[in-house]
From Swiss-Prot:
InterPro entries registered for this protein in UniProt: CheB-like, CheB_C, CheY-like_superfamily, Sig_transdc_resp-reg_Me-estase, Sig_transdc_resp-reg_receiver
Example GO molecular function: protein-glutamine glutaminase activity
Subcellular location: Cytoplasm
UniProt-listed SMART domains: REC
PANTHER family recorded: PROTEIN-GLUTAMATE METHYLESTERASE/PROTEIN-GLUTAMINE GLUTAMINASE, PROTEIN-GLUTAMATE METHYLESTERASE_PROTEIN-GLUTAMINE GLUTAMINASE 1
UniProt organism field: Lawsonia intracellularis (strain PHE/MN1-00)
Protein name (record): Protein-glutamate methylesterase/protein-glutamine glutaminase
Length: 357
């Protein structure tokens, strides 16, 4: 049984989230709280496996509460966020401070304003997945004043004797879901502005979140990071984030690769889809590509990666121990597709090395 505490200042959302969670017989809501102070007291006394946390609350807001949890009694926290630019920015900050994931809070105080069945299934799956992961790999304390340690790929890596010639590969495709934003931030922030490849990212995320995500990455990285637009050219030292609710493809216009932002296939389980991205990169770039699958639930990316690998692409999967949820990378490893399985701390360096393989 997975034990959960729900923290939200809205009685409606406390009730709604509790109803969603208790649809699953393997989840028990052991307490609710209307603000961060009450939430901290109940967390200390009841010791849940997972907490859902609203961001905007009186007395003590969600991010301040999260910082205390991760400093004093680390456990998986799933943020509940409004679908606004401000909500997106606060959520991305919460993920950086240790939250494992988030679910959107739709406007309106009626169950009709939500796709309750889909939200319930998604939330219950996330709760059980992060609880199971925390039991195998307990979360570490994150001090409130901690500065992230960055081990950048040095500029001279690309001018050393082993890498002085033009790299063989110049397109990096990344597929990622649960736990992705801080993981992607870590990888991209370690790359130099002279990085000799273009990076395409399919991060499972709502449409309201992807532009703030790209802007936040751009402010923290030496390379440029942008939300992708249809027709963007491929350039070294730039990372493109696929807009939420759309797909990112790489297509050849004559001999030149060009980004396509499209709605089809509409039947894809996820939008953005790692499968769509990987398949298009494999077909258009073949041996010039590196595919990277990072933390996330499910198996999105595995079919597209089969195409990429069959066309000569190099495949990297994130290690189980460094994932928030070991689903998407596990599918790559179990499918025999991974050329390397790499801890998060080493992905930037291994991606840089893969350009020359």
């Amino acid at each position: 049984m997975t034990r959960v505490i729900v923290v939200d200042d809205s009685a409606f959302f406390r009730s709604s989230i509790t109803k969603m969670l208790t649809q699953d017989s393997e989840i028990e809501v052991i307490g609710v709280a209307k603000d961060g102070i009450e939430g901290l007291e109940k967390i200390k006394n009841l010791k849940p496996d997972v907490v859902t946390m609203d961001i905007e609350m009186p007395k003590l807001d969600g991010i301040s509460t999260l910082k205390i949890i991760m400093d004093e009694m680390p456990l998986p926290v799933i943020m509940v966020s409004s679908l606004t630019k401000e909500g997106a920015e606060a959520t991305l900050k919460a993920l950086e401070f240790g939250a494992v994931d988030f679910i959107p809070k739709y406007p309106g105080n009626s169950l009709a304003s939500m796709d309750l069945a889909a939200l319930s299934s998604d939330l219950c799956t996330k709760v059980k997945a992060v609880a199971a992961r925390a039991k195998r790999f307990p979360l570490k304390r994150i001090r409130k004043d901690k500065v992230p340690i960055i081990s950048p790929v040095k500029k001279d890596f690309f001018t050393s004797p082993n890498h002085s010639e033009r790299s063989r590969r110049d397109i990096i495709a990344i597929g990622v879901s649960t736990g992705g934003p801080p993981a992607v931030q870590k990888v991209l922030s370690e790359l130099p502005e002279t990085f000799p490849a273009c990076i395409l990212i399919a991060q499972h995320m709502p449409a309201a979140f992807t532009k703030p995500f790209a802007e936040r990455l751009n402010s923290m990285c030496k390379i440029s990071v942008k939300e992708a637009e249809h027709g963007n050219p491929i350039k070294n030292g730039i990372a493109y984030v696929c807009p939420g609710g759309r797909h990112l493809r790489l297509d050849l216009k004559g001999a030149l690769p060009q980004i396509s932002v499209v709605s089809e296939p509409s039947t894809a389980l996820y939008k953005p889809s790692a499968n769509v991205l990987m398949e298009s990169v494999g077909k258009s770039m073949g041996g010039r590509s590196v595919g990277v699958i990072m933390t996330g639930m499910g198996s999105d990316g595995v079919e597209g990666m089969r195409v990429l690998k069959s066309k000569g692409g190099f495949v990297i999967a994130q290690s189980e121990a460094s994932c928030v949820v070991y689903g998407m990378p596990k599918a790559i490893v179990d499918g025999g597709l991974a050329d390397e399985v790499v801890d998060l701390d080493n992905i930037a360096e291994r991606v840089a090395s893969a350009l020359y393989k």
